[in-house]
Curated annotation (Swiss-Prot):
GO biological process, one term: regulation of autophagy
Membrane topology listed for this record: Peripheral membrane protein
Gene Ontology cellular-component terms listed: Atg12-Atg5-Atg16 complex; autophagosome; cytoplasm; cytosol; phagophore; phagophore assembly site membrane; transferase complex
UniProt key word Lipid metabolism: no
Location of this chain's protein in the cell: Preautophagosomal structure membrane
Organism of derivation: Caenorhabditis elegans
Higher taxonomy: Eukaryota, Metazoa, Ecdysozoa, Nematoda, Chromadorea
Protein name: Autophagy-related protein 5
Disulfide topology: none
Subunit structure: Most likely a component of a complex at least containing atg-5, lgg-3/ATG12, atg-16.1 and/or atg-16.2. Interacts with lgg-3/ATG12. Interacts with atg-16.1 (via N-terminus) and atg-16.2 (via N-terminus).
Entry-linked InterPro entries: Atg5, ATG5_HBR, Atg5_HR, ATG5_UblA, Atg5_UblA_dom_sf, ATG5_UblB
Taxonomic superkingdom: Eukaryota
Region: Disordered, residue numbers: 221-241
């Protein structure tokens, strides 16, 4: 693991605008709420601060978290996917770089799932365990102390905003040694308007050569018959993670150790290249 690379990834934030659209109120909607959110965080952790701002309006009407839903460009958002992934999926231009999120108080669509803070913590810790099972058959998480798990979650909640505390714990989850390498790499691939995809992917080919992230993504897509992405296109898709165009030849093990989100998965967004 590279300390400086991981720290830069950790410090990355994205600009977000939350706009309330409700059916009630006599004084109109409150002004949009603007904020910078960590890429590694989740909408489930941000929404209470957003609603607190909206609930200060003069007419006294309150918006409750269990009676609202979120959308971007008409698509319901997933509160349990890292904010950085949502931002990268939006594929915003440099001139329109703010992620605009609509907070609606109408009946939520079936595909929207409300996730509160406690649910998000449980989902995050489950992802950590799944990632460790893929890598080490859960050897690390089985031996983690309870306060270490709690410290990892506090770091995601930015309590406190201390990268070094996170670094201490995540190093244990990323340790490898000669003859004790990761069995598989936790990788999730996102294609527009589809659920994320993952498969059992090794860091090396059978001949011992390093698998690249481009090869790994192709393997994940080929294992999914539902994908509409043409991996044989004349123009290879862009691989985006943390807002970075990841070169296809990047070793997968490097990405796993330096570009994974705090849940220990590499989250890669595929963007098709239009000639």
């Amino acid at each position: 693991m590279d300390y400086e690379v991981c720290r830069k990834v950790w410090e990355s934030h994205v600009p977000c605008q939350f706009t309330l659209q409700s059916s009630g109120g006599t004084h109109g909607e409150p002004l949009p709420f603007y904020t910078m959110l960590p890429r590694f965080s989740y909408l489930a952790l941000a929404i209470q601060k957003v609603l607190s701002s909206f609930n200060r309006r003069d007419d006294g009407e309150k918006v409750h978290s269990d009676k609202m839903w979120l959308e971007h460009n008409g698509i319901p958002l997933k509160m349990y996917i890292p904010i950085g992934v949502i931002y990268d999926q939006a594929n915003l231009s440099e001139n329109d770089s703010i992620l605009e999120i609509i907070v609606r108080t109408s009946q939520p669509p079936p595909q929207f799932q409300m996730v509160d803070r406690d649910m998000m913590e449980a989902m995050f810790m489950q992802n950590i365990k799944e990632a460790d099972y893929l890598k080490t058959k859960a050897e690390i998480t089985k031996n983690m102390m309870k306060d270490e798990s709690a410290q990892l979650w506090r770091s995601v909640c930015n309590i406190p905003d201390n990268f070094d505390e996170f670094w201490t714990i995540v190093q244990k989850l990323m340790e490898t040694s000669e003859g004790n390498e990761f069995a598989h790499i936790p990788l999730r691939v996102y294609v527009k308007n589809q659920a994320f995809k993952q498969a059992l992917i090794t860091a090396k080919h059978p001949d011992g050569s390093l698998r690249t992230i481009g090869e790994a993504v192709s393997d994940v897509l080929s294992s999914s018959s539902s994908s509409s992405t043409d991996s044989q296109s004349e123009h290879p898709p862009r691989l985006i993670s943390h807002g970075i165009d990841i070169p296809h030849h990047t070793p997968l093990i490097f990405a796993a150790k330096n570009l994974s989100y705090p849940d220990n998965f590499i989250h890669v967004v595929l963007l098709l290249v239009v000639p």
